[in-house]
């Protein structure tokens, strides 16, 4: 590549219920090392005055901004009007809008906002034309983390993201845009699981495959083939019991994303699965990235995995399998048609079921949930039945969940019962063999909150 470094942007999302409070939080985290701000708009009645309050004292050219949540297209219009009003140089504006009717709309709601999404894509094409001179504004974000957090495999997540991205290209070119105009306005968001080397390879394969897709349309400039990747550490493998282990998961996942060469990264706070993240958890999440940058110097080496036989081979293997699945989706008419036919949702549900079985049989380990639980831990009041109960999908939609939920639901039921079930460990025979079985049994019962009395 042409990069002389491996710098990424430290991203953190602020929930915007009250613009004034959100602005105060944003200013605080900007002074704590964040250089990529996400704003999740909670109200559909968000106004220009609200935007002025939200961005008060924030130097727009100095930070990457991302807007998601309610009425993102309307928010985009407000943001563009503000930029023009303030006369900010177009090359200094770095903003992404999480407009995503294909994945966030179709895949999680089951349908578009209009028949076949015509109004959605016409609006997107209009915004792209308005931002044509803004080189660093991305209008569409392909929300691939939804696949990973719903239980897909790494190959499936990559293939479905590429397929959705290609569908955007086709629809936007049908709306009169060139390949360069469409491709430069796309941004891709992925989840990052604990599968360390596989995740590094996934990001490397993603850039390679996306470049192949865009090159197929013969763009005038190769820069249109570049893929801007945002990564979020996984929510699927987080646990509500022994939650501090989530810090360790977030650290290895952040390392994978950094070594994989992402543009921006958000580490999920360790308590996000059972409460609104605290100031402490959000600070730790930021500091994971800052430590990787300033103490481990992960931002100083370009593609450190390059030349590694294992990772290079893994990259090629993932790319080959993802491309095979991508072509299968294309044969079905592309992402939209394949999704409406149930192919994508059923494929993810099958992968999720296989993962659930592996967790249930401890072929896949989730520390603190199905292996090595904290024997003395009792669920706090912040852990509710809702936080450990998996929502059932209705129809052809994707519903994110966490892999540990089945174990956690069982253990929470025991914790809330007011009783302390006990199991007496009666060991006999050879001491070494008995001890091994005793340790296994202690772990087994503790996963359900059953106290073991060892003789």
Could you tell me what each predicted segment is?
Residues 1, 263, 321-423:
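Intrinsic disorder at enzyme termini
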Residues 1-195, 217, 226-230, 258, ...:
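Catalytic alpha/beta active-site cores
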Residues 33, 87, 210, 260, ...:
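Conserved, mostly hydrophobic/aromatic
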Residues 86, 175-180, 214-221, 299-303, ...:
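Inter-helical turn/loop segments and adjacent helix faces that build the functional surface
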Residues 98-102, 142-149, 182-193, 224-236, ...:
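A glycine-rich phosphate-binding loop feature that marks nucleotide/adenosyl-phosphate handling sites
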Residues 132-171, 251-326:
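Mobile "lid/hinge" segments at catalytic clefts and subdomain interfaces of large enzymes
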Residues 152-158, 193-205, 234-247, 275-285, ...:
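Short glycine/threonine-rich loop-to-helix capping motif typified by GTGT followed
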Residues 189-285:
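Glycine-rich anion/phosphate-binding loop at the beta-strand->alpha-helix junction
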């Amino acid at each position: 590549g042409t990069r002389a470094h491996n710098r990424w942007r430290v991203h953190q999302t602020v929930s915007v219920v009250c613009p004034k409070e959100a602005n105060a939080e944003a200013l605080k985290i900007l002074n704590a090392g964040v250089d990529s701000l996400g704003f999740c708009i909670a109200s559909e009645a968000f106004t220009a005055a609200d935007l002025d309050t939200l961005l008060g004292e924030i130097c727009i050219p100095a930070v990457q901004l991302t807007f998601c949540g309610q009425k993102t297209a309307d928010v985009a219009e407000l943001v563009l009007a503000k930029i023009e009003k303030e006369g900010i140089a177009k090359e200094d504006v770095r903003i992404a809008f999480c407009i995503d009717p294909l994945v966030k709309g179709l895949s999680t709601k089951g349908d578009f906002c209009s028949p076949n999404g015509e109004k959605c894509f016409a609006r997107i094409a209009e915004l792209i034309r308005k931002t044509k001179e803004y080189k660093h504004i991305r209008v569409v974000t392909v929300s691939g983390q939804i696949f990973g957090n719903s239980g897909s495999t790494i190959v499936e997540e990559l293939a479905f993201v590429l397929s959705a991205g290609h569908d955007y290209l086709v629809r936007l070119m049908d709306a009169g845009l060139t390949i360069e105009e469409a491709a430069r306005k796309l941004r891709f968001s992925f989840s990052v699981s604990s599968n360390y080397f596989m995740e590094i390879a996934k990001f490397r394969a993603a850039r390679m495959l996306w470049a192949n897709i865009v090159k197929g349309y013969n763009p005038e400039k190769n820069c249109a083939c570049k893929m801007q990747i945002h990564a979020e550490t996984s929510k699927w493998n987080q646990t509500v019991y022994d939650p501090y282990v989530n810090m360790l998961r977030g650290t290895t996942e952040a390392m994978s994303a950094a070594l994989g060469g992402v543009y921006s990264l958000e580490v999920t706070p360790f308590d996000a699965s059972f409460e609104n993240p605290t100031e402490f958890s959000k600070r730790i999440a930021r500091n994971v990235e800052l430590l990787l940058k300033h103490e481990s110097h992960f931002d100083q080496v370009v593609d450190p995995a390059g030349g590694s036989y294992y990772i290079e081979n893994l990259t090629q293997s993932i790319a080959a399998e993802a491309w095979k699945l991508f072509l299968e989706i294309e044969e079905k008419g592309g992402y939209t048609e394949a999704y409406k036919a149930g192919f994508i949702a059923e494929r993810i549900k099958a992968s999720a079921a296989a993962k659930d079985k592996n967790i249930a049989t401890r072929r896949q380990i989730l520390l603190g949930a199905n292996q090595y639980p904290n024997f003395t831990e009792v669920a706090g009041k912040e852990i509710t039945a809702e936080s450990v109960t998996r929502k059932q999908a209705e129809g052809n939609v994707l519903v994110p969940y966490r892999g540990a939920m089945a174990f956690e639901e069982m253990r929470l039921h025991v914790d809330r019962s007011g009783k302390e079930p006990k199991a007496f460990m009666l060991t006999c025979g050879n001491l070494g063999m008995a001890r091994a079985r005793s340790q296994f049994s202690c772990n087994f019962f503790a996963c359900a909150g059953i106290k073991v009395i060892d003789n």
